[in-house]
Amino acid sequence: AKDVXFGXDARAL
């Protein structure tokens, strides 16, 4: 996943 500002990884969401 790419950095989307939330924890650095879109997989976190």
UniProtKB/Swiss-Prot annotation:
Its main location: mitochondrion. Keywords: ATP-binding, Chaperone, Isomerase, Mitochondrion, Nucleotide-binding. One of its GO terms (molecular function) is isomerase activity. One of its GO terms (cellular component) is mitochondrial matrix. The keyword Cell inner membrane does not apply. It comes from the Eukaryota. Its EC number is 5.6.1.7. It is found in: Mitochondrion matrix. It catalyses: ATP + H2O + a folded polypeptide = ADP + phosphate + an unfolded polypeptide. Homoheptamer arranged in a ring structure. The functional units of these chaperonins consist of heptameric rings of the large subunit Hsp60, which function as a back-to-back double ring. Interacts with 2 heptameric Hsp10 rings to form the symmetrical football complex. Interacts with HRAS. Interacts with ATAD3A. Interacts with ETFBKMT and EEF1AKMT3. Interacts with MFHAS1. Belongs to the chaperonin (HSP60) family. Chaperonin implicated in mitochondrial protein import and macromolecular assembly. Together with Hsp10, facilitates the correct folding of imported proteins. May also prevent misfolding and promote the refolding and proper assembly of unfolded polypeptides generated under stress conditions in the mitochondrial matrix. The functional units of these chaperonins consist of heptameric rings of the large subunit Hsp60, which function as a back-to-back double ring. This is 60 kDa heat shock protein, mitochondrial. It comes from Canis lupus familiaris (Dog).
